[in-house]
A protein has these predicted regions:
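Glycine-rich loops and low-complexity Gly/Arg-rich segments
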Residues: 26, 36, 44-45, 103-107
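Extended, non-catalytic substrate-recognition/exosite surfaces adjacent to catalytic cores, especially
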Residues: 1-36
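Soluble, non-transmembrane domains of envelope/secretory-pathway proteins that act on or interact
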Residues: 2, 7-16, 50-178
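Active-site Gly/Thr loop motif
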Residues: 31-59
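Exposed alpha-helical structural elements
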Residues: 23, 27, 40-44, 171
Length: 178
């Protein structure tokens, strides 16, 4: 923790232990980088800090009591929180409170670039506008990392159809029920 005047209040040097597969860590950080590149944090951080490839995630608790943002660069994981001591609604959401605070932090503590290197079994796959994998180069709208040991086997597969009336597609729910 660093005080407003730049004084270090608390610093920790924890020993790292692998908690998840490298592929899972990569996919999570990639998704969090998209929050800064194209999502909630793009407007506030993208133009000023885009070259650092930051990763982040906004959060808002029920009734707008708390505003959260987690920012990750090549050196630090920073969590910012804004809320009221009496747990009443602050009127802030992740992007209007804690994200702004994190941006101000970066103004005073320049980040290091977070350059991700895909581990083994992560393939860059072309995707069309409907979310289908494309391997012939026709209709590609973007590329996405995919955790697979056989990228070629995914060619031509159709994206699962969304089931009506569900909060999440059935195939997604099934992944977590196993």
């Amino acid at each position: 923790m660093i005080a407003e005047d730049g004084t270090v209040i608390y610093q920790s040097f924890p020993q790292a232990q692998r908690a998840v597969a490298p592929q899972a860590a990569y996919m999570t950080l990639y998704g969090m980088q998209q929050v800064v590149e194209r999502g909630t944090a793009a407007r506030r951080l993208g133009s000023k800090f885009g070259k650092y490839h930051l990763a982040g995630k906004t959060g808002t608790t029920n009734l707008m009591r708390d505003s959260w943002f987690v920012g990750i660069d090549g050196k630090e994981v920073t969590v910012s929180w804004m809320g009221l001591d009496d747990n009443s609604p602050s009127g802030l959401y992740g992007g209007s409170g804690a994200l702004v605070l994190y941006g101000r932090y970066l103004d005073n503590q320049p980040p290091l670039a977070l350059n991700l290197t895909p581990p083994e079994d992560i393939a860059e796959m072309a995707v069309d506008a409907d979310g289908n994998f494309v391997c012939n180069g026709v209709g590609v709208t973007r590329t996405l990392p995919v955790w697979t040991t056989d990228a070629q086997a995914l060619c031509g597969q159709q994206a699962p159809a969304q089931q009506q009336g569900e909060e999440a597609p059935g195939w997604l729910k099934e992944m977590f029920e196993q």
